[in-house]
Curated annotation (Swiss-Prot):
Belongs to the heat shock protein 90 family. This is Chaperone protein HtpG. It comes from Shewanella putrefaciens (strain CN-32 / ATCC BAA-453). Homodimer. The keyword Transport does not apply. Molecular chaperone. Has ATPase activity. Residues 563-637 are annotated as: C. Its main location: cytoplasm.
Length: 637
């Protein structure tokens, strides 16, 4: 036996242990679900490794998990004969959290137990859940294929450190013993443990066993002798792959527990789909839409994808090749009959079978969401609030399904008068005015900025609905979604307003007349502003505001410029088109000014006001304030 070594826990582990004990106390029994789930994973991993090295079974290929309790000692032991761990593996897996984005996770914690317990659940506590009920945890483990004297003993009281030493262990696998706190001794009871296993672990494909005591010989009711029975390890769960069972035999509770097993989520899934596909490719998929977004959904390093099985043998986690990135929130598994057992991520990458399965699974998920949107709008809004921004990546990523994805998108709109994104493109089309051929939208920094934009004035007056977009991804989305059901999406802040048949002949004639009469004013403003603008025009979109700026048809929008600047990208200089409203009193007064210096100052002030309204900021706010103060002083004399 080697000398004992003491190691300090990683800082994040200390924080997690403290939080778990204080935040997960209301659902203590989940410790058993987590530890049994880990044990089943260890069995799956050994089964996979043994495909290429049968010697790892060491003559014992019957994989299982065994649970036992000792009331007198106040202990619970979970033992598996799976893959086991080496000394380095123990230090790595039981002393650190090897996850990207860990620091970000701890920033998200609020100190409110109910919210934090949900976050911790999403993070996946796994092994550390043992400390919810245990004052001390002892782990004895030996990696498959290693010598008996290369086993490891790990021990900790869940405070600041743990000890590790080399021991001898005849059998491979891992044995975890929980020394229960005095107030948690209820878990050292066979019946209590059986009820938890039935509740949480029925779906696990590895047998979960508990010791069934034998009975002595006894007399029957008619005096006959009933022979003694020997004690044995009794299987407590169904121990068959849930996804291979008939759908009609699986309860909603079983589906939900299986979801929690594969996702390590503590909340129920929003919906799921269980299907067997036959034909050119044969595979089974079980797909879940979570009810809550994971805390690290936007972390670029976050692993995502489905669990991959081949002929019921677990192959890998996070097989992202079967799911496009914009559906990365989907959890579940795929079990293929066509892929080879020695399949690797590299083989999956350019495999025609993989591509066909990916196409089928993508359509399946989109179908699930379409059905949800149609059958339960309220539940769909719940989905949208969690994952809508990710789904908006779809039109850029998946050209083949662009129209279907577009039908699932939701936006705020001038029709509802609410910031809630509840309007679909189909809703919009159903309310289009007679003669309307375009879907009008605006992208701004916030809902209020979009809803109150002067660019909407004429459209509001005519009762034409405008979609209000204010998420960072909206500008990216709209660059890849230019039409829907043969209706062009048209920005109200870019180029001409293009009302087409919505503008009658009299209005058009009046607009042309106004432009003609205002031509001298427009030329004066152009001269005053010089190179600050690309052009100056009489507006066709304003009714109550003196002026606005618009982007040219082929130029980069204000929102796209902001996105690129935020990402540190070089941005080309874009000069706006300045539109003025000659019917507004300010512009009318401007036309009467004879002093060209004063005229230039007022023209600049109107331009900067319009830019402030459009961008929310100015390149040189000090110059704007100085000019405004100067104008105020001049008019107070």
């Amino acid at each position: 036996m080697s000398q004992q070594e003491t190691h300090g826990f990683q800082t994040e582990v200390k924080q997690l242990l403290h939080l778990m004990i204080h935040s997960l106390y209301s659902n203590k029994e989940i410790f058993l679900r987590e530890l049994v789930s880990n044990a089943a994973d260890a069995a799956d991993k050994l089964r996979y490794l043994a495909l290429t090295n049968d010697a790892l079974y060491e003559g014992d290929g019957e994989l299982r998990v065994r649970i036992s309790a000792d009331k007198d000692k106040g202990t619970v032991t979970i033992e598996d004969n799976g893959v086991g761990m080496t000394r380095d593996g123990v230090i790595e897996h039981l002393g650190t959290i090897a996850k990207s984005g860990t620091a970000e996770f701890f920033k998200n914690l609020s100190g409110e137990a109910s919210k934090d317990s949900q976050l911790i659940g999403q993070f996946g506590v796994g092994f550390y859940s043992a400390f919810i009920v245990a004052k001390k945890v002892t782990v004895r483990t030996r990696a498959a294929g290693h010598k008996a004297d290369e086993a490891v003993l790990w021990e900790s009281e869940g405070e600041g450190s743990f000890t590790v030493e080399t021991i001898t262990k005849a059998s491979r696998g891992t044995e975890i013993t929980l020394h229960l706190r005095d107030e948690e001794k209820e878990f050292a009871d066979d019946w209590r443990l059986r009820s938890i296993i039935t509740k949480y672990s029925d779906h696990i494909s590895v047998p979960v066993e508990m010791w069934q005591e034998g009975t002595p010989e006894r007399d029957g009711p008619d005096g006959e002798k009933i022979p003694a029975t020997e004690g044995y390890w009794k299987v407590m769960n169904k121990a068959t792959a849930l996804w291979m069972r008939n759908k009609s035999e699986i309860s909603d509770e079983e589906y939900q527990e299986f979801y929690k097993h594969i996702s390590h989520d503590y909340t129920d899934a929003l919906l799921w789909s269980h299907n067997r596909v036959e034909g050119k490719q044969e595979y089974t998929n079980l797909l879940y839409i979570p009810s809550k977004a994971p805390w690290d959904l936007w972390n670029r390093d976050r692993k995502h994808g489905l669990k991959l099985f081949v002929q019921r043998v677990f192959i890998m986690d996070d097989a992202e090749q079967f799911m496009p990135s914009y559906l990365r929130f989907v959890q579940g598994l795929i079990d293929s009959n066509d892929l080879p057992l020695n399949v690797s991520r590299e083989i999956l990458q350019d495999n025609h079978i993989t591509k066909a399965m990916r196409t089928g699974i993508t359509k399946r998920v989109l179908g699930m969401l379409e059905k949800l949107a149609k059958d339960d709008a309220e539940k769909y809004q719940q989905f949208w609030a969690e994952f809508g921004q990710v789904l908006k990546e779809g039109p850029a990523e998946d050209f083949a399904n662009r129209e279907r994805i577009a039908g699932l998108l939701r936006f705020a709109s001038t029709h509802t008068g609410s910031a809630a994104p509840t309007v679909s493109l189909d809703d919009y089309i159903s309310r289009m005015k007679e003669g309307q051929t375009k879907i009008y939208y605006i992208v701004a920094d916030s809902y209020d900025a979009a809803a109150n934009s002067p660019h909407l004035e004429l459209l509001r007056k005519k009762g034409i609905e405008v979609l209000l977009m204010s998420e960072r991804i909206d500008e990216w989305l709209i660059n890849h979604l230019t039409e829907y059901k043969e209706k062009q999406l048209h920005s109200v802040t870019r180029g001409e307003l293009e009302l087409g048949e919505l503008e009658d002949a009299a209005e058009k004639e009046a607009q042309e007349k106004l432009a003609e009469e205002s031509a001298p004013l427009i030329e004066r403003i152009k001269a005053a502003l010089g190179t600050k603008v690309a052009d100056v025009k009489v507006t066709s979109r304003l009714t109550d505001t003196p002026a606005c700026v618009v982007t040219g048809e082929g130029e980069m929008s204000t929102q796209m410029i902001k996105l690129m600047q935020a990402a540190g990208q070089p941005v080309p200089e874009v000069k706006p088109t300045f539109e003025v409203n000659p019917a507004h009193p300010l512009v009318s007064r401007l036309n009467d000014l004879q002093d060209e210096t004063a005229f230039a100052d007022w023209s600049n002030l109107l331009l900067q006001q319009a830019q402030l309204s459009e961008k929310g900021s100015l390149a040189d706010p000090s110059a704007f304030i100085k000019l405004m103060n100067q104008m105020l002083l001049a008019n107070m004399k």
